[in-house]
Every structure is written in structure tokens, then in C-alpha cells.
């Protein structure tokens, strides 16, 4: 069962067992082991910001514990694999430094640094939304041009310019049509 969970975790990171785990930016993720640290130990400091992340964190850590040494992404610098046990006598929790992991909550000092950035992000996103709205108004002008009436092409025959004709051409044009060129309609065969 441990190997199956290991495969699931490796699939979550987008790698196969035996390959190092990498985050979304392509950096190698090191899985570290730590002993006897409850998953909610650092979350006691900041309970006012609890969004149910502890439940997700515990589930993820449980999966990582069951994975044990079957993962190929364990800390590659040490070369040794630690095994997780299910009996509770010795539990090695494997925690990832991957950004999407629900790691234990940071200390109060780092929260103070993050709060202004969240507020700034909110201001920035609202400003971006306003500029997007303005952009939509501006681009709507350009995206829908006024309808153009269809152009009707009228073929007008321009009069032929007067060209100097030779006396022979003038004579030919003044002659009446010859009877051989005109055929009567009654003589047509069916």
C-alpha cells in the first residue's frame, strides 16, 4: 500500500517514482523528515486566520508518511531512505517544501510581513480590474467598426476617345451592313 501512495504523491508532483520531485518552476523539491512534531504545533499562534488548512495539511502529511522510502524524490543529498511505520511507535513525517503544500503556519513576524503584501495585492488587483475595465471600453471601440455599406460596382461604358481615323476607316464605318452578314430569323433550321 505504501508504494501505491508513493505513486499517487509522485503523480501529484508530476513525476514518476525514481525521478526527483520538481515544483511548478522546475526547482527540485526536497522532502525532509522530522520527528515527533504535531501537525498543528505552529498553527496555535495564528488560529484567527484558520481556513481549514490544517485538515488538508494533516491529510497530505499522512499520505507522505505512508509513502516512506518508496518515493524517488527523498532528499537526494543524503542517499539513505527512511522508512515510515504505521504502528505509531516511531513516526517519521515527510514534509515537502513545495509551495502548494499546506505547510505549518508561519510565525507572527512573517505574518506581519505578509499582511501588507496581501493588502497591497488587493489594491493592485482592484487597480488592475479598473484598468481592465477601461481597456475593455477602449477596445470595444476598435473591435466593432461601424458597418460599411456594400459598394455597388456599376460598369459604365465610357465613350471611346476620338482617335484620328484614316479615310479608309471612315468609309467602312459609313457603309450599310451587307446582306450576307444578316440572317433572317425564318431561315434558321430546327
Swiss-Prot record:
For bias kind Basic and acidic residues, which ranges apply?
80-90
Which residues form each disulfide bond in the chain?
Answer: none
Mind listing the UniProt keywords for this protein, alphabetically?
Answer: Host cell membrane, Host Golgi apparatus, Host membrane, Lipoprotein, Membrane, Myristate, Palmitate, Phosphoprotein, Virion, Virion tegument
Iron-sulfur among keywords: no
How does the record describe the protein's post-translational processing?
A: Myristoylation and palmitoylation (probably on one or more of the nearby cysteines at the N-terminus) enable membrane-binding and Golgi apparatus-specific targeting and are essential for efficient packaging.
What is any one of the record's Gene Ontology cellular component terms? host cell plasma membrane
* Basic residues bias (residue ranges): 108-123
In which residue ranges is the amino acid composition biased (Polar residues)?
30-43
Xref: InterPro entries:
HSV_CEP3_betahv
Q: Where is the composition biased (Acidic residues)?
A: 44-58, 130-139
Q: What is this protein called?
A: Cytoplasmic envelopment protein 3
Amino acid at each position: 500500500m505504501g508504494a501505491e501512495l508513493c505513486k499517487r504523491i509522485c503523480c501529484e508532483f508530476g513525476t514518476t517514482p525514481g525521478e526527483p520531485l520538481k515544483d511548478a518552476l522546475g526547482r527540485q523539491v526536497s522532502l525532509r523528515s522530522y520527528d515527533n512534531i504535531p501537525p498543528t504545533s505552529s498553527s496555535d499562534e495564528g488560529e484567527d486566520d484558520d481556513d481549514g488548512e490544517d485538515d488538508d495539511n494533516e491529510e497530505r502529511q499522512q499520505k507522505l508518511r505512508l509513502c516512506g522510502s518508496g518515493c524517488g524524490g527523498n532528499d537526494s543529498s543524503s542517499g539513505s531512505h527512511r522508512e515510515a511505520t504505521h504502528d505509531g511507535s516511531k513516526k517519521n513525517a515527510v514534509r515537502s517544501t513545495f509551495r502548494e503544500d499546506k505547510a505549518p503556519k508561519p510565525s507572527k513576524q512573517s505574518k506581519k510581513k505578509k499582511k501588507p503584501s496581501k493588502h497591497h495585492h488587493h489594491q493592485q488587483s482592484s487597480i488592475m480590474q479598473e484598468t481592465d475595465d477601461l481597456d475593455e471600453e477602449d477596445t470595444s471601440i476598435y473591435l466593432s467598426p461601424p458597418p460599411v455599406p456594400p459598394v455597388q460596382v456599376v460598369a459604365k461604358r465610357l465613350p471611346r476617345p476620338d482617335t484620328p481615323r484614316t479615310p479608309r476607316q471612315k468609309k467602312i464605318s459609313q457603309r450599310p451592313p451587307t446582306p450576307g452578314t444578316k440572317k433572317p430569323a425564318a431561315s434558321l433550321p430546327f
